Amino acid sequence: MRAIDTNVLARYYLQDDHAQARIASAVLAGGDLFVPRTVILELEWVLRFVAEQPPEKVFACLAHLLGLPGVTVEDSDKFETALKFCQHGLDFSDALHLAASGACRELLTFDRQFAARSRRRALKPSVRLPTV
C-alpha cells in the first residue's frame, strides 16, 4: 500500500496541470492507496479556498474519493457522516467535528450558527452553547 498526498489528489480533481493530472489518474487507477485524514482536510481546503470551487463540487469530489476502489481513506466512516451533515447546511469542518463526536452526548461550541443549524435539523450529537 502507498500513501497519497494532497497535491496528487488536487491534480486529479482539478485537472489544472495536464502532465501531473495524467500521472495522478494513473496512480489512482492503480489502487492500493491510503489517504490520511489530514490529506482529506487539506484537499477540502485547497479545492474550496485555493481553487475556489463551490461547496457542492468539493463535496462531490470528496464523496467520489471515498467510493474509489482500491483507495482506503483513514476514518472514512466519519467523512461519510460529515458529508451527510454537509447536506444539512453545515460547513465541512463543523460537520467533521460533529461526525467525530458521535459517541458523545453533545458538542459544545461558541459558534451560534453551528449550534442553530444542528438543532434545526436535529443532528446528533446535539450541539449547544456552553454555559456555567
What are these regions (language model features)?
Residues M1, A99, A103-V132:
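Acidic, PIN/NYN-like endoribonuclease modules and their adjacent C-terminal/linker elements
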Residues M1-V35, V50-F59, L68, R121-V132:
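Short, well-structured N-terminal submotif of metal-dependent ribonuclease cores
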Residues I4, L41, F110:
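Active-site flanking residues adjacent to catalytic metal/cofactor-binding acidic residues
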Residues N7-V8, T38, R112-Q113:
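Alpha-helix/helix-capping structural signal
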Residues A19, L68-Q113:
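Active-site neighborhoods of divalent-metal-dependent phosphate/nucleic-acid chemistry enzymes
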Residues D32, L43, F49, Q53, ...:
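Mobile, glycine- and charge-enriched loop segments
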Residues R37-W45:
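Short, conserved active-site loops that position catalytic residues or coordinate cofactors/metal ions
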